[in-house]
Amino acid sequence: MGQERISLTEQELRRYKVISHWMESSITGVEAAAKLGLSYRQVLRLKKKISKEGATGVIHKNRGRKPAHALPDSLKTTIREHMTGDKYHNCNDHHLSELLAEHEKIQVSPSTIRRIRIKAALPPKKKRRPPKSHRSRKRRAQEGELVQLDGSPHHWLEDRAEPFSLLAAIDDATGKIVTAVFRPQEDTEGYFQLTEQMARSAGIPMAVYTDRHMIFRSPKDKLTIEQELAGESVPLSQYGQALKELGIEHILAFTPQAKGRVERLFQTLQDRWVIELRLMGVATLEEANKCLPKLIEKHNRMFAVAPSDKRKCIHPP
């Protein structure tokens, strides 16, 4: 009767050889533990198993067994179908994990989604790039100390409607979306609406931070030397005058890089809200505006941070 063949992995073979040297007194138990990167107690257990079972003593008893917590193949197939279907099209791994739990009652981690995607040879939504080395501006300490206003034109409803703009007010200390509105384009009326909503729902902030769009500044915002000597002040835009009357300081950004935080927020919203609006069946700008409170609440619940100073820098309208 022939001997049974034993198949060992490279790691198992190394463990068997090292423990065998120990058993032959070629090395000590401490040296065996160091060579294998194990504790002395672990190598002692291996030695006892090999003494009793021979080479099979290094084979893990779960080898070849399907883990008890492994996903059923049928569930993996369902997840792959969701990955390639229209419903969750263009969804990243983290967002898909959230949406499957919310809409399909499928609880799987983003890392599980990623493993299934890689095994199915499906590309990621975005290539992973190393983070850029840049110095982030420190957040303001108090909620309401600074609110950033900006707009983002985008195909928010994909091919179900023409592109339109999202105007949003973002608190700098917390990252909260204070309020937002969808508009056909970025315009003065839209920012008046945004500011009124902000004042009514959250109060009046100390300062707002915007880009240098003509909505926010007068085309005649540079004075001649003669005008400066005469004591004339820079004329304000219609929106700038409204901020002055509300007692809100208006800070203009000098470079697009100065608005990095709000620009990154809009990238996140474009990634997520396009899919969320699709799942809601939204087909018009008016319907999109009705869904904004729900979208804002969900975003703030997931992404807002606590301010470093709990006091609020807000006064009522």
State each model region's role.
Residues 1-3, 9, 20, 29-84:
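Short, basic alpha-helical/linker "hinge" immediately adjacent to a nucleic-acid-recognition surface
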Residues 10-16:
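Short alpha-helical elements of helix-turn-helix
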Residues 18, 32, 43-46, 54, ...:
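Mobile genetic element proteins and their domesticated derivatives, centered on retroelements
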Residues 22-24, 87:
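Short amphipathic helical patch at the helix-1/turn junction of helix-turn-helix
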Residues 54-155, 226-234, 313-317:
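Basic, flexible linker segments flanking DNA-binding modules
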Residues 102, 106-107, 118-177, 184-206, ...:
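Mobile-element integrase/transposase regions
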Residues 199-231, 254-256:
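Acidic/histidine-rich, metal-coordinating catalytic segments
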Residues 232, 238-316:
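Charged alpha-helix within mobile-element recombinases
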